[in-house]
Amino acid sequence: MVAKLEQLIAQTILQGFDAQYGRFLEVTAGAQHRFEQADWHAVQQAMKKRIHLYDHHVGLVVEQLKYITDQRHFDVEFLARVKEIYTGLLPDYPRFEIAESFFNSVYCRLFKHRDLTPDKLFVFSSQPERRFREIPRPLARDFIPKGDLSGMLQMVLNDLSLRLPWENLSRDIDYIVMAIRQAFTDEQLASAHFQIANELFYRNKAAWLVGKLRLNGDIYPFLLPIHHNESGELFIDTCLTSKAEASIVFGFARSYFMVYVPLPAAMVEWLREILPGKSTAELYTAIGCQKHGKTESYREYLAFIHQSSEQFIIAPGVKGMVMLVFTLPSFDRVFKVIKDQFAPQKEVTQARVLECYQLVKEHDRVGRMADTQEYENFVIDKHRISPELLAELQHEVPEKLEDLGDKIVIKHLYMERRMTPLNLYMEQADDQQLKDAIEEYGNAIKQLAAANIFPGDMLFKNFGVTRHGRVVFYDYDEICYMTEVNFRDIPPPRYPEDEMASEPWYSVSPNDVFPEEFRHFLCSDRKVRHFFEEMHGDLFQASYWRGLQQRIRDGHVEDVFAYRRKQRFSQRALN
């Protein structure tokens, strides 16, 4: 009877995963229709819905198992046998690696994230040699120009499944040919071989054609973002052929793509050639398998810990008033723990901080907010923690610590991509770098605001600079929707003495924001003030912010470009 129960539990979990991934594919398959209908609000809702599917189905399976087992507690041997039986169901299973993550999630939900050991759940994959094997159905089609690049592109684009007419396809093809010829020599292009993914990658208001360009043994990305105009006609906005550009398109600060992937491991392996700087975790996350991306992130962390003797240290930069942040000197991620007590000037609660981080997970991050992975009962060997960090942990987060003697358990933390704090970057920057950083910072604020996100605390220390020089927001404890804020002009003083008073001469409500004050705390440095006024002086005007609010209330969804505006074909035509 017990053996049958173990079998039933294993099969119930796998069937639950089948149901979840089926719904995942169903929501994803609707991306083309939403794009063709220009139903951008439905795009946003589908993104949130797909993110919630995973936890919803984990919850359904957990309730089933509680009913099946009558909520009995099982010993270690029983749980190990369930995992063994589950593993035996996976050898011919097409998505076994994500099924392993689903098993982990069910286990963690049942046992409150306790006893996370390899004998009970899939800390490591059961079949690492099978993860990126050959697949029966090709993911891409091959095209060779044979001296007629324009003709080949015509064939590629006419072969797409999109059912809308083109605005001016021959014009767009001319632009693509021009971009390719500017990027590569005739000698390189003589051996050109294109591989075009069968499925389009949908995100925001664009459908991306994703391909590879093979030239004399070298491989380059070939990315075409397809948009529509107001008449419902298609146009291609640019052509990207560098790995740095592709890395930004698939960046950790962007929403997940909607791409139909019955075999995600195969897609991850296919993408790896054009995104060599992306980890396995980042690639799974980019195509919407963010929960498995979390599993892979943890495995990458374990691999680093195993190969390194570094100690965890307090992260460089200004210490936060809400979060304690630490890292490993050579690791590309940071760890963030919500403090037990906040600084007096922070009027937020622990629950509100958790809500803010969840909001960021579900919202369109427009390339300006870092994605995070959330972990519970995170175990660290005590000897790997520097004395300074250990003291900081014991002082700032004692309620979230459990001391096991040789190990420390942190009950809740976030893992996030490591960046250079913007304030530290600006201190070391030359004039051109400083100007570029201010331009990026202002663009980040404006793009977040257009996506209905107000950062709250806009100090430079709350932003980071990526390896591609992009500025990304990463301090979420004060974020809110733009539509919740009351942007006000500062009233003129009643008397000359008003300006000298320590208290304002006007009333201030909790949601009031005075953009004129931004100049005071952002522009104390003369050079910074000059660059800011030159490029983003409108951020100091309440009317600018109110105008954005009105566009949001009117239902307008802004375009989000994963490349600079000057790279758009429409901008080239103007120049």
UniProtKB/Swiss-Prot annotation:
The keyword Glycosyltransferase does not apply. Pfam families: AceK_kinase (PF06315), AceK_regulatory (PF20423). Keywords: ATP-binding, Cytoplasm, Glyoxylate bypass, Hydrolase, Kinase, Nucleotide-binding, Protein phosphatase, Serine/threonine-protein kinase, Transferase, Tricarboxylic acid cycle. It is found in: Cytoplasm. It comes from the Bacteria. GO terms for biological process: glucose metabolic process; glyoxylate cycle; tricarboxylic acid cycle. The active site is at D371. One of its GO terms (cellular component) is cytoplasm. The keyword Cell inner membrane does not apply. Its EC number is 2.7.11.5, 3.1.3.-. GO terms for molecular function: [isocitrate dehydrogenase (NADP+)] kinase activity; AMP binding; ATP binding; phosphoprotein phosphatase activity; protein serine/threonine kinase activity. ATP binds at A315, P316, G317, V318, K319, G320, M321, K336. It catalyses: L-seryl-[isocitrate dehydrogenase] + ATP = O-phospho-L-seryl-[isocitrate dehydrogenase] + ADP + H(+). Belongs to the AceK family. Bifunctional enzyme which can phosphorylate or dephosphorylate isocitrate dehydrogenase (IDH) on a specific serine residue. This is a regulatory mechanism which enables bacteria to bypass the Krebs cycle via the glyoxylate shunt in response to the source of carbon. When bacteria are grown on glucose, IDH is fully active and unphosphorylated, but when grown on acetate or ethanol, the activity of IDH declines drastically concomitant with its phosphorylation. This is Isocitrate dehydrogenase kinase/phosphatase. It comes from Yersinia pseudotuberculosis serotype I (strain IP32953).
